[in-house]
Amino acid sequence: MKAYPNYKNTDQLWLPEIPEEWQTIKIKFAFWERSEKGYPNEPLLVSSQNMGVVPKTLYGNRTVEAQKDLHLLKLVRVGDFVISLRSFQGGIEYAYYQGIISPAYTIMASRNVLASSYFRYLAKSYAFIELLKSCVTGIREGQNIDYSKLKNHRIPIPSRPEQDQIVRFLDWKVSIVNKLISIKRK
């Protein structure tokens, strides 16, 4: 992708400037917080920085056992984004499956303002993770992201065709990196 000819300043410390044609919106206008409970028959999900939000059965590592009161866990739908206690380290995770997850997590449901594939990359970017760190509460190893703070920060919104182009470019670059990793392992 070519560099943009002109940029404009934003009022966001985490993102000082964006291409001139882009807009910014507050996160609360792109997502709403879902907190549905009472679905004990849904599969248990885990949030993984490497895999996204997936069923616990697919996640090989040891995880904390779910509480007995499964009806207290939050419902996650495919396409939601999940803020976990590790999001300040690795970004917000995309839900590839429907199920239930810890009530300590924040579920962000899309308002369909932007392409989820675009936000998946944005939510894992270094700059966005720095923004998440500025919204942390707590002092223990796993820390909460205060969604009431986060939702008032602005995110960059290119046009939908441009979002798609950015995703295609990043998918292509990731595939090259993955091929190089595969060659190195052989």
Feature locations, PLM:
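Non-catalytic DNA-recognition/assembly elements of restriction-modification systems
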Residues: 6-39, 152, 156, 160, ...
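A short glycine-rich beta-alpha junction/loop motif
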Residues: 7-9, 85-86, 99-106, 139-164
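Sequence-specific dsDNA recognition surfaces
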Residues: 10-11, 25-78
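Short, ligand-facing micro-motifs at secondary-structure edges
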Residues: 40-62, 81-106, 117-121, 130-136, ...
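Ligand-binding loop in jelly-roll beta-barrel domains
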Residues: 110-115
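Interdomain signal-transducing alpha-helices
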Residues: 119, 163-166
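Amphipathic alpha-helical coiled-coil segments
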Residues: 170-184
